[in-house]
Amino acid sequence: MNPSTAQARVVVDELVRGGVHDVVLCPGSRNAPLAFALADADRAGRLRLHVRIDERTAGFLAIGLAVADRAPVCVAMTSGTAVANLGPAVVEANYARVPLIVLSANRPYELLGTGANQTFEQLGYFGNQVRANISLGLAPELSAGSPGDMTSLNAQWRSATCRVVVAATGSRSANAGPVQFDIPLREPLVPTFDDDGSCPPGRPDGKPWTHTPPVTFDQPLDIDLTPDTVVIAGHGAGVHPNLADLPTVAEPTAPPAANPLHPMALRLLRPKQVIMLGRPTLHRPVSALLADPSVPVYALTTGPRWPDVSGNSQATGTRAVTSGTPDPAWLRRCKEVNDHAVAAVREQLAAHPLTTGLHVAAAVADAVRPGDQLVLGASNPVRDAALVGFTPHGVQVRSNRGVAGIDGTVSTAIGAALAHDRTGGRTIALMGDLTFVHDSSGLLIGPTEPTPRNLTIVVSNDNGGGIFELLEQGDPRFSDVSSRVFGTPHDVDVGALCRAYHVDNRQIEVGQLADALDEPHEGMRVLEVKADRSSLRALHASIKAAL
């Protein structure tokens, strides 16, 4: 067995032992030893391999798999720009705390600075965006007469791989996130003709080489619930049963609220204190409340970092130790304004003469059912789901909220669907046309690759960036400029794009969406709904006026 083959087999075996169920592989020459080892593990049923040609989409496919499966996922690639293309996915994984392992093959380090082809200083390329940069080191030449060398190397390689998994899952830090595992590989890069497919042994019974129990991170925080309190539950919020009775503005990716409070209802209330769960990312009324220096904010998170954009948090912890009882009058008032806000949104939607992205979001929100998984685009769709009063009881909701980019959303949805397929449930993804077009190469799934069994991508197509209609850039004063440089109309034929990737698709009206989503189907499909963005500003103004 040559050194690179031995090294790759040990790494793959130890990754499986550490809980890796899925690996995304991008083709290349330098990572050939890893590719052979991964293919062997896939054939043996030890992991599921997904081959992709674009590292950018591969990274987000891995994020979708990791988030939905709650397990570390590797993405393996060759040296050079292949590694650099993982940048956006690594940044998202950092801030969303996703256990993404970048398995980057490299040339021998002595070639750095020599002008060797496809070579750059890739170890450490991601800087402080990763939890760790770990190098396996170049495998030495192996001698058949020195079996002790292989025994020592096997232990070193397995130990290093365990460090990678522990850093990615946060087993010792309570802070999961991306890790770069850089492996310089010497030639030959393919198994020898007489190779018997063996692998140096790991621990008995399939255990990892170094067992690391998950760390417990517990910081109780005393909070008196007597003052009028609202809970703001953002991305990554934990479950807090002792806060369930409090009015809660919950983002779609947060645990569903038992006592929901519409985000637009905050303008009608004067809370005396706020309990912030996770990291709020969506609503301006929420940001304004958290920035109010007269309102104490208590931050509860599931890890060592806590958000505090305005510097207004008075205390942090991981769980609340509560005292006092909420005023029943306050709870009644919050319920009244929530019901009023939800009704106002729905009434204005019904009265609006044109179909907008908000209408599409309402139709999707009404169509999902317990057991579903819903993936929301990071621009308007995730906000629209909250505005239409969506409370996802029994529904797993995903959205890339780490740094909230639109890139990689198609791939994230496919990865999440592939993981959710194991439950037998369906996955629905809602995204805008820019988000869809931006990651359209994510639709490319080769004929030999695992394909989602039940994924519907709903594209709300308003031919551009509808979110800018609602921001300052969409002010009518700038109409002569904003339509082009912010709206960015593209005139892409979504149906033709889908056909190029052999993806089933059709265009429907918003009123047909509920029935279409309820149709039995197999595989992946796209439902396109044409929408208007020119009237979004007026629609939102009418909702605010109704409140």
From Swiss-Prot:
The keyword Cell division is assigned to this record: no
Broadest EC class assigned to this enzyme: transferase
Pathway given in the UniProt record: Quinol/quinone metabolism; 1,4-dihydroxy-2-naphthoate biosynthesis; 1,4-dihydroxy-2-naphthoate from chorismate: step 2/7; Quinol/quinone metabolism; menaquinone biosynthesis
The record's free-text note on cofactor binding: Binds 1 thiamine pyrophosphate per subunit.
Keyword DNA-binding: no
Cofactors that this protein relies on: Mg(2+); Mn(2+); thiamine diphosphate
Function description: Catalyzes the thiamine diphosphate-dependent decarboxylation of 2-oxoglutarate and the subsequent addition of the resulting succinic semialdehyde-thiamine pyrophosphate anion to isochorismate to yield 2-succinyl-5-enolpyruvyl-6-hydroxy-3-cyclohexene-1-carboxylate (SEPHCHC).
Subunit structure: Homodimer.
Identification of the protein by name: 2-succinyl-5-enolpyruvyl-6-hydroxy-3-cyclohexene-1-carboxylate synthase
Gene: menD
